[in-house]
Amino acid sequence: MSMTTCECRSPQEQRLYDKIEGREDRFRKTHPRVFRLLERFEGQKPRIDIERALYFTQSMQETEGQPLVLRWAKALMHIARNMTVYVQEDQLLLGRAGCDGRYGILYPELDGDFLDIAVRDLPTRKTSPATITPEDARRVVEEIAPYWKGKTYHEALNAALPAEVHKLTYDDPEGLISRFIVNETSSFRSSIQWVHDYEKILKRGFNSIKKEAREKLAALDPLSAKDDREKRPFLEAVMIVCDAIVLWAKRHAVLAREMAEKESDPVRKAELLRMAENAEHVPGEPARDFWEACQSQWFTQMFSRIEQKTGTTISNGRMDQYFQPYYKQDREAGKITEAQAMELLECMWVGMAEFIDMYISPTGGAFNEGYAHWEAVTVGGQTPDGRDASNDLTYLILKSKREFPLHYPDLAARIHSRAPERYLWDVAETIKYGSGFPKLINDEEIVPLYVSKGATFEEALDYAVSGCTEARMPNRDTYTSGGAYINFAAAVEMVLRNGRMKKYGDQKLGVETGDPRSFTTWDQFWNAYVEQHLLFLKTAFTQQYIINKLRAEHFAQPMGSAMHDLCMKHCIDLHQEQIPEGINLGYFEYMGLGTVVDSLAAVKKLVFEEKKLSMDKLIAAIDADFEGYEDVRALLRSAPCYGNNDEYADAIGRDIDRISVEYGNKYSMSDLGIHNDVRYVPFTSHVPFGKVVSATPNGRTDGFPLSDGSSASHGADVNGPTAVLLSNCTTKNMGLRDRAARMLNIKFTPKCVEGEQGTEKLVSFIRTFCDLKLWHVQFNVVNKGTLVAAQKDPQKYRNLIVRIAGYSAYFVDLSPDLQNDLIARTEHDVM
């Protein structure tokens, strides 16, 4: 069905259709500034800006032998002094990490051994390409890359992995290509997703933090070796980085004043002078009004992205909470209108859209298609005393997401049992718009779980969403290492192939559990799967053990640490060691839950219980990728499936979850010193993970994507969306602590949620999600015909936004494989 013949369209589809037909966007008149800003980079391929990498490298060359945290701070000061600053036409906020338009920056300390490959391949690679000028490419190869050869974190990790771990991790000796079996993720980002305490900066400013560091420095014990060798460098680094961000801001103020002197338009002249005044005051000092609060937060966010690759996944935190006092004050004083406040927020949204989180390694690129971004803004939730926290700014941000024609920022709405009807209605109306916002995160699951891990109720109630589905507690979270992604569908294949995989030939990768044709009982098959499963978990935990040992030698985060209460209290950088009083929330990802559950259910039911299929014939059909075995495939696809509230399948899923969580309970704290929780959050990696797995016993064909997150297999959820929620609930072991996020994707047709009745149904569905204590759910509201049409004519559908993993992206920026994956997801037309 083509878009032009759809009986019912989402508002996004209608907006897109209006543009195709040449009609003006109805929001252009109310958002003229933002539309002008957007049109300057619409459809633009990102450009790599090398200044951050160049100045960081220059400084690190000069400071060898000094404590790493001090070197990092000095590098940030060198960047702050020398990096080009910009004042964009029409913008009301100052601060960029790179050039005009869409841009990305490089972090050579992380994966600089990929730089030669990156500058060669980035412009032409199929997923998330970027441009780089010939001169910048030359400087990368000649001035930046040589220094980092042999010094990068990725090289150190690759060398440290034992052979039995390496063979399940990488497909080459240098560790450039992943095997997509047990995949480490720490080498293409400096840290997992993070949330800063922005409220602290708005209320205190960096000059106050510098003063605190100076006082702590003066109070150190002059006879203590630890104070001298560890605390002193940390505090000196904090003082330097506080000066660096203030200097960087003031350089923007100078440029804004220079531009104001030349500006002939009196309105723009006044804006530039006010922007200069803002940058002279914040983020060094406390914000005095809403505009300064936005500017202070934006400087902080952008300098965090300059600091390290954590910054590319820096969450915006609970923006409706920490901005609300400034918004309320200015509204009551008549200093700002709702439209002016929205314009400031949307200037920030534009800045987020221009910064592209570039993954230069082949594996990182495969994991994060469509220029993945996780700068989540969290709205709603609860106050420290447990009351509903929604306010005027909550509704303004939701309204902006319905009117702002871009997939930035990512938006997360916290849901709890006492959420007011007005809030849920606005959330539902925003979901119905069709661009995938907001994703929903459930207080009823997260708050008690975090209390069980050691948080106070007040701390747990103040969590903010970060990354795809993560929940972070500012000033209590202290763990930064990325976790492993584990392809458990490969474990099923290894049972069928005696520890081997078709993709990798005769190499023994897993446990030799025997020829499955010799198995006479389901228990034998199940136990063989458990052996492979446990090997994968041990491999992941071994990776994490080594990662934890290496990170302190390669990373420091003086600015992020300066904003963290516990880091300042104990004078410890976030990357250096376990921080006293912190809660270390790590994770490993279960890839392919639906694929594995359905495969095991089919084997149990059809081979061992009903004996409708022999193991020999099953393996022959899988080896043939079901060609000539269409009857076998049809039989397999008729077996019980996860996502249908079918206890037969769901019980297997619950057992799988229990094995993973119990392993974590046993070894996380003893071996790693962290809560290494099981999660089901694939980003876009279920596509490349599926490419290495041959056909599976659920009827999935060779190379087809695995099921994503905690969602059902493609087309397997035939009993409606509520059954999907119920399966998600019943496969979770509620009584076990070391568990975390479950990403759940659901696709509705616009007709399903049409009108007020559709909104009422969606609100009811959200309340069911909340009552079942599920972690996360997100929606696509789009017609399949629109997606198919966009594949055929990508230029015409350039602005079509879809929900992918924990973020939204332009559909046409996705690979054909990921586009097809989205199209193949079950489309629910009733609720």
Swiss-Prot record:
Keywords: Lyase, Organic radical, Pyruvate. Its EC number is 4.4.1.38. Residues 708-831 form the Glycine radical domain. InterPro entries: Form_AcTrfase_GR_CS, Gly_radical, GRE, PFL_dom. It is an enzyme of class 4 (lyase). One of its GO terms (molecular function) is lyase activity. This is Isethionate sulfite-lyase. It comes from Desulfovibrio desulfuricans (strain ATCC 27774 / DSM 6949 / MB).
